């Protein structure tokens, strides 16, 4: 019989145990927990990513892996910020043993809080809006709607291109790891799903837990392939417009054409694996 006990997250690192207001748990994954907290001032929101220790691993190996992974993520973010790519800025980080903290056994990374809506939600809301209203839209209105989403797709391509130009591979490119940051706070999206969402603003890449540094076309192509598959499984209505993502990507840096050529090979391998099962 399944347990009905509420989930209890692991203890917070000591710097955050008495924070006011307390950190708010947003998501929990196999490797990390994401909280919303504040940095230095109650009016300055921040994202806190906590990597708890893994009791099933040898303690020495666990500490080494946790430290390596949090540092790898932070280094990628710092490099991208320096290159002008839209990603959260690193505010602070620590791991067990660095500050003498005992009992926590993990690592944490505090980052700039990115206001906005996840691109997955934006596209899902737009698809629902179009499904409900398509019959009532005239040809001109339909073209305007499609032009809006094409522009967003191209901006996604520009964002991924800027990432790869800087020599960083995301490792988990999905629309859940892209945030559409509105130009002003006044343009925050309403909560109702019935609305037609705004698509204005910058595309910000988040969640670099699987990121690495590489200039290899193969790695770039796999990154793009993961994003393409994400569109196919999550956004069937906008999947045919994925060519706009690739168009924006091609415009973003000189070596993009080589990565796109390699993408064709990655697609072929993916199709063969699907056929074999």
Swiss-Prot record:
Its EC number is 3.6.-.-, 2.7.11.1. Keywords: Activator, ATP-binding, Chromosome, Cytoplasm, Hydrolase, Kinase, Nucleotide-binding, Nucleus, Phosphoprotein, Serine/threonine-protein kinase, Telomere, Transcription, Transcription regulation, Transferase, tRNA processing. Residues 20-277 form the Protein kinase domain. GO terms for molecular function: ATP binding; hydrolase activity; protein serine kinase activity; protein serine/threonine kinase activity. InterPro entries: Bud32 (IPR022495), Kinase-like_dom_sf (IPR011009), Prot_kinase_dom (IPR000719), Tyr_kinase_AS (IPR008266). Residues 7-24 have a biased composition (Pro residues). Disulfide bonds: none annotated. The keyword Transmembrane does not apply. It is found in: Cytoplasm; Nucleus; Chromosome, Telomere. The keyword Transcription regulation applies. The active site is at 172 (proton acceptor). It catalyses: L-seryl-[protein] + ATP = O-phospho-L-seryl-[protein] + ADP + H(+); L-threonyl-[protein] + ATP = O-phospho-L-threonyl-[protein] + ADP + H(+). Residues 1-24 are annotated as: Disordered. It comes from the Eukaryota. Component of the EKC/KEOPS complex composed of at least bud32, cgi121, gon7, kae1 and pcc1; the whole complex dimerizes. Component of the EKC/KEOPS complex that is required for the formation of a threonylcarbamoyl group on adenosine at position 37 (t(6)A37) in tRNAs that read codons beginning with adenine. The complex is probably involved in the transfer of the threonylcarbamoyl moiety of threonylcarbamoyl-AMP (TC-AMP) to the N6 group of A37. BUD32 has ATPase activity in the context of the EKC/KEOPS complex and likely plays a supporting role to the catalytic subunit KAE1. The EKC/KEOPS complex also promotes both telomere uncapping and telomere elongation. This is EKC/KEOPS complex subunit bud32. It comes from Aspergillus fumigatus (strain ATCC MYA-4609 / CBS 101355 / FGSC A1100 / Af293). The lineage of its organism: Eukaryota, Fungi, Dikarya, Ascomycota, Pezizomycotina.
């Amino acid at each position: 019989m399944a347990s009905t006990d509420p989930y209890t997250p692991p203890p917070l690192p000591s710097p955050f145990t008495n924070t006011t207001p307390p950190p708010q748990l947003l998501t929990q994954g196999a490797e990390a927990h994401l909280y919303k907290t504040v940095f230095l001032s109650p009016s300055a929101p921040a994202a806190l990513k906590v990597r708890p220790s893994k009791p099933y691993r040898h303690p020495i190996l666990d500490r080494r892996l946790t430290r390596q992974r949090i540092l790898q993520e932070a280094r990628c973010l710092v490099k991208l910020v320096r290159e002008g790519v839209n990603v959260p800025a690193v505010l602070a980080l620590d791991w067990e043993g660095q500050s003498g903290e005992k009992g926590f056994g993990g690592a944490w990374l505090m980052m700039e809080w990115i206001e906005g809506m996840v691109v997955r939600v934006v596209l899902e809301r737009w698809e629902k809006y179009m499904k409900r209203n398509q019959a009532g839209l005239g040809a001109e209105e339909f073209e305007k709607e499609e032009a809006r989403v094409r522009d967003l797709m191209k901006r996604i391509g520009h964002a991924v291109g800027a990432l790869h130009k800087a020599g960083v591979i995301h490792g988990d490119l999905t629309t859940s790891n892209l945030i559409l940051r509105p130009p002003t706070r006044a343009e925050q999206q309403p909560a109702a799903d019935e609305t037609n969402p705004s698509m204005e603003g910058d595309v910000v890449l988040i969640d670099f837990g699987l990121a690495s540094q590489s200039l290899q076309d193969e790695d770039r192509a796999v990154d793009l392939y993961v994003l393409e598959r994400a569109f196919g499984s999550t956004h069937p209505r906008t999947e045919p417009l994925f060519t706009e993502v690739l168009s924006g990507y091609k415009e973003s840096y000189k070596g993009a054409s080589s990565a796109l050529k390699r993408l064709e090979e990655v697609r072929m391998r993916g199709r063969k694996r699907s056929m074999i099962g």
